[in-house]
Design a protein with these regions (language model features):
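Cytosolic catalytic headpiece of P-type ATPases
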Residues: 104-108, 148-149, 219-222, 297-298, ...
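N-terminal leader/targeting and accessory segments in enzymes
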Residues: 1-124, 287, 311-317
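Structural signal for conserved beta-strand scaffold positions within catalytic alpha/beta enzyme cores
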Residues: 76, 101, 114-115, 139, ...
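Anionic group-transfer/hydrolysis microenvironments
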Residues: 66, 78, 104, 141, ...
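Short, charged/polar "capping" segments at the starts of alpha-helices
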Residues: 104-109, 256-261, 283
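Phosphate-binding loop of NTP-binding sites
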Residues: 46, 119-254, 260-271
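Short, ordered loop/turn segments at secondary-structure junctions
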Residues: 2-3, 103-105, 168, 219-221, ...
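Adenine nucleotide phosphate-binding catalytic loops in nucleotide-utilizing enzymes
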Residues: 7-14, 26-34, 55, 78, ...
């Protein structure tokens, strides 16, 4: 934008615009996808949550004031019947640290963190929490037995270190990211339940969880109305294999009709397969089962070892 330069007693006509043209500078501007922008935006919020003293007592996310705990951060998710914005006063009254919302709200301004989209924030925040965890992660799916197995694994792992377990049956597109939001650096293990009612859901959820160890309990007819056949359900449950960390493990029920089908999928991804079941070829299988009134005594072969267990009368597969 200069038109001249003064040199000693001379005025020299000059155009920096023309100079720049001669340089033939090419600007390569890399466009950031909208998803990446949202992720970066949420990352900034996450960094704020970590650094700000006010957030150090942050204890997970909540989308339901009925189950909200003190120091939770409340997200105003809009559902079919209700909009979370209506419940902001109740959330704060119950002790919510902050409110995450996309709405312009002047009231409670010091407690509001504005985001572009609440659902995206929930998923991206869960992903960031997973990024910052060094825990060994388990993800359990299957047509039946998920919740009871999750609770049993939790009880066992507690003996070896601090363990986080997803509450109740938090296994859907809200429950899984909410569970991940409570994972912290003190946790040595994390146990998560992953459910589905249609194709693609387990893939999306396990992208967030990224388990070291995946478990498929069985393939049954639950949600068969959304699939052509049982093979479709096996494919949907098998989506967990896509997101098991490289070099990880898949635990499969050898007695299930889709054992070999799922095993092949896992081997293609270089995932180690550990089998269990009543079939004697299983890596883990019972040699002797003695059922009593209240307890069951089991003699179990695990590889080359024999283990004797006395358990309550629960599902032997668990």
């Amino acid at each position: 934008h200069e038109t001249e330069q003064i040199y000693k007693d001379k005025i020299i006509a000059f155009s920096d615009k023309e100079v720049v043209k001669k340089l033939k500078i090419t600007l390569k501007i890399k466009k950031i996808s909208s998803k990446k922008k949202i992720y970066l935006e949420n990352k900034k919020i996450f960094e704020k949550l970590k650094k700000d003293k006010k957030f150090r007592k942050f204890k997970g996310l909540s989308i339901d004031t009925r189950t909200l705990k003190k120091k939770n951060v409340f997200i105003t998710i809009k559902g079919k019947n209700n909009d979370g914005v209506k419940f902001i006063p109740e959330a704060l009254k119950k002790g919510a640290s902050f409110i995450i919302t996309s709405k312009n709200i002047k009231k409670f301004e010091n407690k509001i963190i504005k985001v572009k989209n609440e659902n995206n924030f929930l998923n991206n925040f869960a992903s960031l929490k997973r990024d910052n965890s060094n825990a060994k992660i388990f993800a359990i799916t299957g047509s039946a037995g998920k919740t009871s197995l999750k609770n049993l694994i939790h009880e066992l792992l507690k003996n070896f270190g601090e363990t986080y377990c997803s509450p109740k049956s938090y296994n859907n597109h809200f429950g899984v990211p909410l569970s991940l939001s409570s994972l912290n650096k003190n946790h040595k293990y994390g146990v998560f339940e992953v459910g589905m009612s249609k194709k693609g859901e387990i893939n999306n959820l396990t992208k967030l969880v990224r388990p070291h160890i995946g478990i498929i309990t069985n393939i049954g007819e639950a949600h068969i109305e959304n699939f052509k056949n049982l093979r479709g359900i096996a494919d949907a449950k098998g989506e967990i294999i896509n997101n098991i960390i490289s070099g990880g493990t898949l635990i499969l029920n050898r007695d299930d009709n889709y054992f070999n089908y799922l095993k092949k999928k896992a081997i293609k991804r270089n995932i180690k397969v550990v089998s269990y079941g009543k079939d004697k070829r299983s890596y883990v299988h019972p040699i002797q089962i003695s059922k009593g009134k209240d307890k069951t005594k089991l003699k179990v072969k695990v590889g080359n070892q024999i283990i004797i267990l006395s358990i309550k009368n629960i599902n032997i597969y668990n």
